[in-house]
């Protein structure tokens, strides 16, 4: 048995969907433990491309149980659209379950999210405008709705009658927006509730039963370490905890059941939205990475900012998550480059540092210290073993493993499921050096 967490080691969009899909073949249960529809996972199987937002990537395996856990926030309208879309493609959702204690994104959450971002002006954060932050804010403020509230029509309407007027004060007086009608919200959400009812369960109990019966459980995070509310580049972060520790809280399990933590990182770095990004490239190389890597957000369609691999934030992700091994994705995007840079430290205003600074203002003034490696100038998309990779591509991976002080278990060389090099079984293999890294 192995219970594994898959976590993003950068600013999200690392390719966790593909890695989770790949690992789901040996998982009995896949659990999405935090976030909402602000995340997007793209999985390519043969000629089909699946873009998922809230439903775990394991849904593509008919016998795998998929859980949307308590730590997530659920937009009923979008979730139902996602379910319908999968079923139209012939993908069954009979093994999909939604935690009754997950919080619900309401219409006013979206309105407030968009209006507040506009009000911030030049201080905007870069939110997706999907209402995620306001939903988590109401959760913390104890004024939120949970999925189980939707299942109780009388109590739901009663709560709406005192919450909606409060939100209308904000909408009308602060944001100059029209008020919401209680009747309209109630009718809309109670209709959603009836459609979602067959999926709603006590998710923590289901997960506990899976643990007790020695099932393989895969915990799937959204976003990435540097977007974590507590450990990311605050305030340019999400409103939940994508780090490995968030899996235990979001899923309702104890840390002692976790066997492995796998970090996913691109062979370069991307970021969506605002915030410091030391290795960002605003030149032809940056444009090449964006075009070759199809760097557009699955959820928003916004172009991602692109830059060189940052080993400083990588080491930070290793430390914060306790990573056992890494999956490096999109190596093939670098195939045509003459030379490739890796950030190994930062020049801060007064000194050179090799560790990530917590202060976003200081981080914004850091300049990258690079080491330059030769490119390999040949395609890698056909490679299925390390030996088939160009020697300089292997050298690059060795360098990343050494800088991160963490072994690499998987290498992705294309979007499709089969375009993956399995260096060593990331779930059942021994925790030892891969690609020559020995922990020194």
Curated annotation (Swiss-Prot):
EC number of the protein: 6.3.4.4
InterPro entries: Adenylosuccin_syn_GTP-bd (IPR018220), Adenylosuccin_syn_Lys_AS (IPR033128), Adenylosuccinate_synth_dom1 (IPR042109), Adenylosuccinate_synth_dom2 (IPR042110), Adenylosuccinate_synth_dom3 (IPR042111), Adenylosuccinate_synthetase (IPR001114), P-loop_NTPase (IPR027417)
Sites where the protein binds Mg(2+): 13, 40
Binding residues for substrate: 298-304
Keywords annotated in UniProt: Cytoplasm, GTP-binding, Ligase, Magnesium, Metal-binding, Nucleotide-binding, Purine biosynthesis
Subunit structure: Homodimer.
PANTHER family xref list: ADENYLOSUCCINATE SYNTHETASE
Protein name from the UniProt record: Adenylosuccinate synthetase
Organism: Gloeobacter violaceus (strain ATCC 29082 / PCC 7421)
Lineage, top ranks: Bacteria, Bacillati, Cyanobacteriota, Cyanophyceae, Gloeobacterales
Gene that produces this protein: purA
